[in-house]
Amino acid sequence: MYPNPLIYCTCWDPWNLGPRKLIKTPHPLPKASIRKPIFPAPISREPNYLLSQPAKSTAFPRDKAQSRKLEESNKAPSEVIEVSPGYKLVRNREQISVTLGDEMFSRKKHLESGILSKVKISRSDIISDLEEQISELSAIIEQMNRDHQSAQKLLSNEMDLRCADMKQKFETESRELKQTHKEQLEKLENSYKETLKVEKAAAQEKLDEMGKEYKYLKNMFHMYQDSIYDEMEDKWSRRKAEWEKDEKMEREKILLQQKHRITKKFELESEEEKRKMNESFSTVMENFTREKEELIRQHNEDILQMQELRKAKEILEAELRTQAVVLETLNTSLYHCQIELQREKTMAGNLEKLFQTKLAEAEEKYKSTIQVLTEENNSLRQKVLTISTNEEIFEERSEKSSSASPNIYES
């Protein structure tokens, strides 16, 4: 037999209640001495050795729902099985209890004083009885495990059938709902079309009536306008004849006076305009020459910057083969150069706009100089474009060299 009284079988534990306290088997009898034979003590008639009393487990406390289930299972009806004479098995959903009587060991008690029982229960008989009981218990537990598995399979099959039924119901209901929704939409569309037709017809009738009224009012207005126009023409023709006589006399006097005033004003204004035109012309020419010099100076600076950039490019190509850390500083300098070039592009665009506005105001004498400046501007644009293309080529080469430099370091 097992020396430990706690035996736990995982094959039958559907509610995960953990180990249970099984029956305590009697310890092996001590070896009897030759002189005084020692008989095993009679087993006390206590009510039950419960298999299902839970040991003090170190696990965390169960949920309240599980404790309620345990209480309900304790109240559930139990089944009594008499395995052998003097050995009763009581089981329910949650626990198994065993009752051992005196009949199991077939002992005879003698109440006479000084006389010991002559019947001696051998140790091998007790062990064989207990082994038989354990085999019967294991068979019962295996049967219960089989029953539990079959019940679980039945429940799973029922759940599958219910799920299939629910899916079919859901599909049929969804189809019916879609059909009803489609029919309702069609009804609403038809009703909406009918109402639109009715409203359209009513609106068309109103438009026809209003058109007729408008034509009638228009004809009446034209007639009234013609009558008023005739009356006004008669009145104005009379007054006009009178006014023309008076105005002729007054006009002649006023025209003579105004003629003298206008001639004096015109002479003064013409002199002032000539002076202003000369001043503005001189200022425009000065500004034009100044801006031209600035543009030429900026163009020379751009050429110098391009030469410096080319030199820097050669230096960078030489340094990129040996150093990878200098790339960050060169990238920043390139970024600043790009910003400066973009600023210069914007300045060149602004200057072009100013040139166009000022050259439009200048006279035809300076058309040749304007053409020269436009040609210079075009050349500047081409150079700027070449600069941008050179920068793109330089960036591509720098990217290629930067991608090649880590490979060099890895090698």
Swiss-Prot record:
PANTHER family: FLAGELLUM-ASSOCIATED COILED-COIL DOMAIN-CONTAINING PROTEIN 1
InterPro entries reported for this sequence: FLACC1 (IPR026674)
Residue spans of biased composition, Basic and acidic residues class: 61-74
Residue runs in coiled coils: 124-220, 278-328, 355-385
Modified-residue entries (N6-acetyllysine), positions: K353
Tagged with keyword DNA damage: no
Keyword Protein transport: no
Region listing for Disordered, in residue ranges: 52-77
Designated name of the protein: Flagellum-associated coiled-coil domain-containing protein 1
GO cellular component: cytoplasm; cytoplasmic vesicle; outer dense fiber; sperm flagellum
Compartments, as annotated in UniProt: Cytoplasm; Cytoplasmic granule; Cell projection, Cilium, Flagellum
Main subcellular location of this protein, as a coarse class: cytoplasm
Swiss-Prot/TrEMBL keywords: Acetylation, Cell projection, Cilium, Coiled coil, Cytoplasm, Flagellum
Gene name, Swiss-Prot/TrEMBL: Flacc1
